[in-house]
Amino acid sequence: MALKRINKELQDLGRDPPAQCSAGPVGDDLFHWQATIMGPPDSPYQGGVFFLTIHFPTDYPFKPPKVAFTTRIYHPNINSNGSICLDILRSQWSPALTISKVLLSICSLLCDPNPDDPLVPEIARIYKTDREKYNELAREWTRKYAM
């Protein structure tokens, strides 16, 4: 079941890739993918290229994939291990969701962080109290790690 679904998503991604994103298997292992997200324009991540790993569970799509950034990023919802705080990767997962939709959700999280549910409270505090400093630090990390 999982393999069939993963193959179908791979074909759909090839036919109709989401804007600013790409993803595909690492070598022959269809359960382990690498994804790329381009820093969205008009965000402090603009110009950066961010890499992520995707691990599909054997009972996919009934359980969510494990998605993590391998590129460091300054963001209140993404910690230094690359873990992402995004409801659809946890409690709000649904088998109707696809990797394409997950990547688009992560893109929109980059444009629009959720400081009220942070993985990194200190970054969330700066985001809420000093947006200019947040943008400056996010741009600096993007230049340092994603270019």
Swiss-Prot record:
Pfam families, alphabetically?
A: UQ_con (PF00179)
Cell division found in the keyword field? yes
Q: Which InterPro entries match?
A: UBQ-conjugat_E2_core (IPR000608), UBQ-conjugating_AS (IPR023313), UBQ-conjugating_enzyme/RWD (IPR016135)
Identify the residues that the record assigns to the UBC core domain, covering every copy: 1-147
Q: Which sites are catalytic?
A: 85 (glycyl thioester intermediate)
EC number(s) on record?
Answer: 2.3.2.23
What is catalyzed by this enzyme? S-ubiquitinyl-[E1 ubiquitin-activating enzyme]-L-cysteine + [E2 ubiquitin-conjugating enzyme]-L-cysteine = [E1 ubiquitin-activating enzyme]-L-cysteine + S-ubiquitinyl-[E2 ubiquitin-conjugating enzyme]-L-cysteine
* GO MF term list: ATP binding; ubiquitin conjugating enzyme activity; ubiquitin protein ligase binding
Top-rank lineage group of the source organism? Eukaryota
Q: Which GO terms describe its biological process?
A: anaphase-promoting complex-dependent catabolic process; chromosome organization; compound eye morphogenesis; compound eye photoreceptor cell differentiation; female germ-line stem cell asymmetric division; germ-line stem cell population maintenance; male meiotic nuclear division; mitotic cell cycle
Give the family from UniProt.
Answer: Belongs to the ubiquitin-conjugating enzyme family.
Record protein name field: Ubiquitin-conjugating enzyme E2-17 kDa
Gene from which this protein is expressed: eff
